[in-house]
């Protein structure tokens, strides 16, 4: 049954609760599945360099479908798009459980995630508006952060107990998300009847990319956020190999605990940025970006668990302080030039392309036999230099 949109819809309406629950379960599954599947690769004696390939097939789906998923979200009821996307994730996780190639199953999850992303943000504006919309976005981000923390840890802890149990828990989470999506009101499509000419859709998307790249502020933001998230994903995989070498700990849970420290730090840094940085003073965030690389370098040399926890939380604080102002700048300037939806789609393309590139370089470094500690040192140094170059470039323009 279709329901009309009411601008004064309660923040805790049935539909909004369903969206938040679905988002939590879907993000929980995403983060738990990564570490559960990494544990499966270890158990099945896949080479170490294959671990980042797992994430590469995931982000590859984002890149491949980037020009089209926004229109999919606008052409159908967003709650149903979310349900279909979570269904794809469920299919991918279940296929890994039943012994299908993990890279194939994880690719299916990536396709689902690519379709899910624009729908989950777009539906908030259809369920509520005004000050409630800001609060709804806050609830969405809070549920996502909680899911990242709990999902990452659950994936590692359950995998230490039994890999199949961890994978089944991920499939169960996606199944719960599908059920939650059923309770989202079937709202009218935002822009029905659009052309599905793939060439025109791709051309329109590329025009948005060109427009944002030609603007100095949005170009600066795109490069900065892409470098940050590319580095963040690479750090996740670096930790998986670094923990047994530097700390002598071989379980699956410890890397997830360390990743959780970064997520907690990002929340703290984001809060500080909201108070200390404005769109007019975005350059204040740049020293934090440079320090991320420096602290990663120092972290790579550690051999004790407590300093590792502290340094990773510091990396998260610096990361939150760095990336939040850049996101705000892109959303504000992009909204005026190509529209907020297109700006987010282009940003997703940039960030996932950076992830693909950095993970590819990291995988190659592991494949040729470079030890993980020197990889971490080089990674930190190169990131610091890249952000320094970006800052100099921004000041020139």
From Swiss-Prot:
Function: Catalyzes the facilitated diffusion of 2-acyl-glycero-3-phosphoethanolamine (2-acyl-GPE) into the cell.
InterPro entries: LysoPLipid__transptr_LplT, MFS, MFS_trans_sf
Main location: membrane
Naturally occurring in which organism (per UniProt): Escherichia coli O127:H6 (strain E2348/69 / EPEC)
Superkingdom assignment: Bacteria
Residue stretches spanning the membrane: 18-38, 53-73, 91-111, 145-165, 167-187, 227-247, 257-277, 281-301, 305-325, 344-364, 367-387
Membrane side Cytoplasmic: residue ranges: 39-52, 112-144, 188-226, 278-280, 326-343, 388-397
Cellular compartment(s): Cell inner membrane
Protein name: Lysophospholipid transporter LplT
A family per Pfam: MFS_1
Keywords linked to the UniProt accession: Cell inner membrane, Cell membrane, Lipid transport, Membrane, Transmembrane, Transmembrane helix, Transport
Coiled coil: none
Gene3D superfamilies (UniProt xref): MFS general substrate transporter like domains
């Amino acid at each position: 049954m279709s329901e009309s949109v009411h601008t004064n819809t309660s923040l805790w309406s049935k539909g909004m609760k369903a969206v938040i629950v679905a988002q939590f379960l879907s993000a929980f599954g995403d983060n738990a599945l990564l570490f559960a599947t990494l544990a499966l690769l270890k158990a099945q004696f896949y080479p170490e360099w294959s671990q980042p390939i797992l994430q590469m097939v995931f982000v590859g789906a984002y890149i491949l479908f980037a020009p089209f998923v926004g229109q999919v979200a606008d052409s159908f009821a967003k709650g149903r798009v979310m349900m279909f996307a979570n269904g794809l994730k469920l299919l991918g996780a279940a296929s890994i459980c039943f012994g299908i190639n993990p890279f194939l199953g994880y690719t299916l999850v990536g396709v689902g995630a690519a379709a899910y992303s624009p729908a989950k943000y777009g539906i908030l504006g259809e369920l509520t508006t005004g000050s409630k919309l800001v609060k709804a976005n806050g609830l969405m981000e809070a549920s996502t952060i909680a899911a990242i923390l709990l999902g990452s840890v659950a994936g590692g802890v359950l995998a230490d107990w039994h890999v199949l149990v961890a994978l089944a828990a991920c499939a169960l989470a996606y199944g719960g998300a599908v059920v939650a999506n059923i309770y989202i009101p079937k709202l009218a499509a935002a822009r029905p009847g659009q052309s599905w000419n793939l060439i025109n859709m791709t051309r329109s998307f590329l025009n948005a990319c060109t427009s944002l790249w030609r603007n100095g502020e949005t170009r600066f933001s795109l490069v900065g956020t892409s470098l940050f998230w590319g580095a963040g994903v690479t750090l996740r995989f670096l930790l998986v190999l670094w923990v047994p070498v530097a700390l002598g700990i071989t379980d699956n849970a410890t890397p997830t605990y360390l990743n959780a420290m970064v997520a907690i730090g990002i929340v703290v840094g984001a809060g500080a940025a909201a108070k200390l940085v404005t769109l007019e003073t975005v350059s204040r965030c740049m020293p934090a970006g440079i320090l991320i690389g420096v602290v990663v370098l120092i972290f790579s040399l550690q051999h004790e668990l407590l300093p590792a926890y502290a340094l990773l939380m510091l990396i998260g604080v610096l990361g939150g302080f760095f990336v939040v102002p850049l996101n705000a700048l892109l959303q504000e300037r992009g909204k005026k030039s190509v529209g907020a939806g297109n700006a987010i789609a282009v940003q997703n393309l940039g960030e996932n392309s950076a992830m693909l590139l950095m993970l590819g370089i990291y995988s190659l470094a592991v494949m040729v036999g470079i030890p993980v500690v020197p990889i971490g040192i080089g990674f930190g140094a190169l990131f610091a230099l890249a952000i320094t170059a970006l800052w100099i470039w921004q000041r020139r323009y």
